[in-house]
Regions:
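Bacterial N-terminal signal peptides
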Residues: 27-37
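Active-site-adjacent loops and short helices of periplasmic peptidoglycan-processing enzymes
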Residues: 42-199, 203-208
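Bacterial N-terminal signal peptides that target proteins for export
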Residues: 5-28
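Domain-terminus/edge residues, biased toward the C-terminal soluble/receptor-binding domains
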Residues: 175-179, 187-327
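Hydrophobic alpha-helical membrane context
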Residues: 36-37, 75, 93, 295
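Juxtamembrane/membrane-water interface recognition
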Residues: 18-21, 36, 84, 151
Length: 327
């Protein structure tokens, strides 16, 4: 039976895995692979999307199920906030800051990202003090630009220095082609990311900071007596989604990074270049549902099964069995 994988020859001539570096690689045994679910599904696996760029990955094995120009550099828009949050989570994990650490709202944060800006905001009051925990909720749930800037200034002293930290940290965790210029994702001609890097980043956050990742599934947050719902459209769909974020710029269109679990397996996707927020939600749902149905896990070898014999020269025996390791 000939099996077909969900990617084009121009993108990936053969199935790839996306590594988790520098932390432990969560790859399954080579004896476990994801294959098209049936001969019929082998043809259906030739999926397409209206997105200009797209990437779908199965998390446990790191298998790329679908890719469409995922290394093209695009404007990240609010998806840059994933990198901002990684730095905040890292600072919490290493003890540099605490969840109840208080930061003061500067005039820059208020004017650039707060109520006067007209953008996504948690409506932080000028010169008020806000805890790191509340700022995290503001950024993740409300996509708050003021929350990002307050955190950046509090941790690094200025947003410019924080952006330098973002770039250094991005390299440390395995991002290859992305450049950050601010904590919010507000337009900057030099600020670019790839979907490959965004999925790598999302995957890293999910595995390294499970206690903070849960905030991405929070449905709403109220600050300054203003109630706002989570902006991630995937949370409203019945597909098992529990994160991550969205973004929009005129040049890159509507984009999204989403993470969802189905039948005990996690899938992470990124889309960009969509025409409307409605189309973004529709295409995101479509690619997740396709991934759930088009592939199945296949155990090629049983645990402890002899796969082959290896010749031994000068030993007691002429050969030794090669067996599938215990899982």
């Amino acid at each position: 039976m000939r099996l077909s994988y969900a990617m084009t020859e121009t993108d990936f001539p053969r199935q790839r895995t996306l590594p988790l570096q520098p932390f432990r690689k969560l790859a399954a045994s080579l004896a476990v692979v994801l294959l098209a679910a049936s001969p019929v599904h082998a043809q259906e696996a030739l999926f397409d999307t209206k997105a200009k760029q797209a990437l779908m990955l199965e998390d446990q094995t790191g298998t790329i199920l679908y890719a469409k120009t995922p290394d093209t550099l695009i404007e990240p828009a609010a998806l840059a906030k994933l990198m901002t949050m990684e730095l905040v989570f890292h600072a919490l994990k290493t003890g540099q800051i605490k969840i109840d650490t208080q930061y003061t709202v500067s005039e820059n944060a208020w004017r650039t990202g707060g109520a006067p800006s007209g953008g996504s905001t948690m409506f932080a009051k000028l010169k008020s003090s806000i805890s790191v925990g509340d700022l995290i909720q503001g950024v993740i749930v409300q996509s708050a630009n003021d929350g990002c800037i307050i955190l950046a200034e509090g941790i690094a002293g200025s947003e410019q220095k924080f952006a330098e930290m973002m770039n250094a940290r991005a390299k440390e965790i395995g991002l290859k082609n992305s450049t950050f210029r601010n904590s919010t994702g507000l337009p900057d001609p030099e600020q670019k990311v790839s979907l490959t890097d965004l999925v790598t980043l999302a995957r890293y956050i999910k595995h390294e900071y499970p206690e903070y990742y849960r905030t991405y599934a929070q449905e709403s947050f109220t600050w300054n007596n203003i109630f706002q719902r989570n902006r991630n459209p995937l949370l409203k769909l019945d597909i098992g989604a529990d994160g991550m974020g969205t973004g929009y710029t005129e040049q890159s269109g509507y984009g999204l990074v989403g993470s969802a679990e189905h039948n005990g397996r996690r899938y992470i996707a990124a889309l960009s270049g969509l025409a409307t927020d409605k189309e973004r939600a529709e295409e995101a749902k479509k690619i997740f549902e396709w991934a759930y149905s088009a592939f199945e896990e296949v155990n090629i070898f049983a645990e402890g099964e002899t796969i082959a014999e290896a010749s031994v020269f000068g030993g007691v025996k002429s050969s030794v069995p090669l067996k599938e390791h215990e899982r």
